[in-house]
């Protein structure tokens, strides 16, 4: 990048905290931020200096912008001169996201860490309720699962069920390296997805992740799949976000 780069801003999708630490330890200032088209992009962003950055957060709110967390559902609400007046010639859509007090409803759920660092926990529409009436935010759990080098993609499910479960797509490249070092003959991805070593490695990580979750959030069952999700396959959007409804129907 020319040797003159001072810092980079990361947005659009969550940056894995583990990866964020690696960047910072390597001297690469990758500062995670948050915003939407409707807010003229930036709402909050991490800054230089230890007092202005928190790993796992999207930083302090920028000057001139107000942010509050809705008491009833934790939705992030934004207000300020950078927030849009409304969608062009679409008052119905505008009314769905702008309230009478001028707060824009982002559709994202979050909280403040230490009173000033905004942290995104999930998308409001992706939160589901179990049969016991407990609400589960899948994104936070999925990010914990993807810290395992043998898990490439995952989706937490459980709406209307007694407990949460997960669909897991292995990182076949990393498992192939493991097999090579362990003297295990590599076959096809389909066959290796059911290999006992892969099941053991993934289950160990799931157990570790469960220890940091509330009892009602803990995964009771995981299904390891034999093919990656893709845009062409219809499971991912062009931004590589999960098409949850499609995946749920497919599996």
Task: Annotate each predicted stretch with a short phrase.
Residues 109, 114, 148-173:
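C-terminal boundary motif of the adenylate-forming
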Residues 61-70, 74-130, 147:
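Conserved ATP-binding/catalytic segment of the ANL
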Residues 1-13, 196-210:
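Alpha-helix-centered segments that form part of catalytic cores
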Residues 159-183, 212-226:
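Conserved loop-to-beta-strand segment in the C-terminal subdomain of adenylate-forming
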Residues 1-52, 152:
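Gly/Ser/Thr-rich phosphate-binding loop
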Residues 35-39, 106, 130, 237-239:
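Ser/Thr-glycine-rich phosphate-binding loops at phosphate-binding pockets of nucleotides
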Residues 83, 117-146, 175-196, 215-219, ...:
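Adenylate-forming
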Residues 153-155, 203-251:
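Conserved C-terminal "lid"/linker of ANL adenylate-forming enzymes
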